[in-house]
Swiss-Prot record:
Glycan attachment sites: 100, 164, 209, 219
Name recorded for this polypeptide: ADP-ribosyl cyclase/cyclic ADP-ribose hydrolase 1
Organism per entry: Homo sapiens (Human)
Main location: other
Database matches in InterPro entries: ADP-ribosyl_cyclase
Other comment: A cell surface antigen recognized in lymophocytes by multiple mAbs.
A cellular-component GO term for this protein: nuclear membrane
Segments crossing the lipid bilayer: 22-42
Impact when changing residue 201 to D/K/A: Loss of cADPR hydrolase and ADP-ribosyl cyclase activity
Length: 300
């Protein structure tokens, strides 16, 4: 310790005592050491304590594997370089603050994943993901967002990085409600949802959950992003399929106030609107598989 010294003590029992100056230096040194330990141990842990779950395990490997599988199944996408796709995906969030992600960060990935979906073949959905995906598994020429390359890559995954490092954060990621909305996952889905809606043309279908209190929720991705990015010069009609929760529910949910709100929004954008009750979703899927079945002529 610089400028600190030991002082002899007079008396019958000689010993070594620290001078007041030395004691002060020692105390300051101990405090500095404690502070260093706190900064090294506590601060990194504090940075990781977001409210949401951490990045999905084996995230890089999962994205790459999904890309390879998708491009093998879809011949029109075989030109895609999956390593470049992963590099662009990673570049959108690595080393960036996980609450300060922008749509621009994802633009390189968007360009690599550009994909043309035929007119009349887009199916949007809100709060009824499983049935929408069951439908497109049967009706193979219809596409939800998750049936496109970019949607397929990220479906059900979580990811974020650590600010100013090249690390992926596997401990926790921001929750869009509790922490911030400009997080890597939320911004990704907002970006791809907007592009998906902008590309839609002719008749666009949307599947809505009739068992929810708000059948159309203007705060959902469909209500806040996709509805407002349908292009009137390309889209003729938005047709809503309202899925009923049980056979005993015979109400006309197309008259629900939230559906009327949706109709008003769409009409003001110079797009036609139609609505259909799907009273029996199980029968609905059966009739998609076998449209010639005589029972499919009745209302489902």
């Amino acid at each position: 310790m610089a400028n600190c010294e030991f002082s002899p003590v007079s008396g019958d029992k000689p010993c070594c005592r620290l001078s007041r100056r030395a004691q002060l230096c020692l105390g300051v040194s101990i405090l500095v050491l404690i502070l260093v330990v706190v900064l090294a141990v506590v601060v990194p842990r504090w940075r990781q304590q977001w409210s949401g779950p951490g990045t999905t395990k084996r995230f890089p490997e999962t994205v790459l594997a999904r890309c390879v599988k998708y491009t093998e199944i879809h011949p029109e996408m075989r030109h895609v370089d999956c390593q470049s796709v992963w590099d662009a995906f990673k570049g959108a969030f690595i080393s960036k603050h996980p609450c300060n992600i922008t749509e621009e960060d994802y633009q390189p990935l968007m360009k690599l994943g550009t994909q043309t979906v035929p007119c009349n073949k887009i199916l949007l959905w809100s709060r009824i993901k499983d049935l929408a995906h069951q439908f497109t598994q049967v009706q193979r020429d219809m596409f939800t967002l998750e049936d496109t390359l970019l949607g397929y890559l990220a479906d059900d995954l979580t990811w974020c990085g650590e600010f100013n490092t090249s690390k992926i954060n596997y401990q926790s990621c921001p929750d869009w409600r509790k922490d911030c909305s400009n997080n890597p996952v939320s911004v990704f889905w907002k970006t791809v949802s907007r592009r998906f809606a902008e590309a839609a043309c002719d008749v666009v279908h949307v599947m809505l959950n009739g068992s929810r209190s708000k059948i159309f929720d203007k705060n959902s991705t469909f209500g806040s992003v996709e509805v407002h990015n349908l292009q009137p010069e390309k889209v003729q009609t938005l047709e809503a399929w309202v899925i009923h929760g049980g056979r005993e529910d015979s109400r006309d949910l197309c008259q629900d106030p939230t559906i009327k709100e949706l109709e008003s929004i769409i009409s003001k954008r110079n797009i036609q609107f139609s609505c259909k009750n799907i009273y029996r979703p199980d029968k609905f899927l059966q009739c998609v598989k076998n449209p010639e079945d005589s029972s499919c002529t009745s209302e489902i």
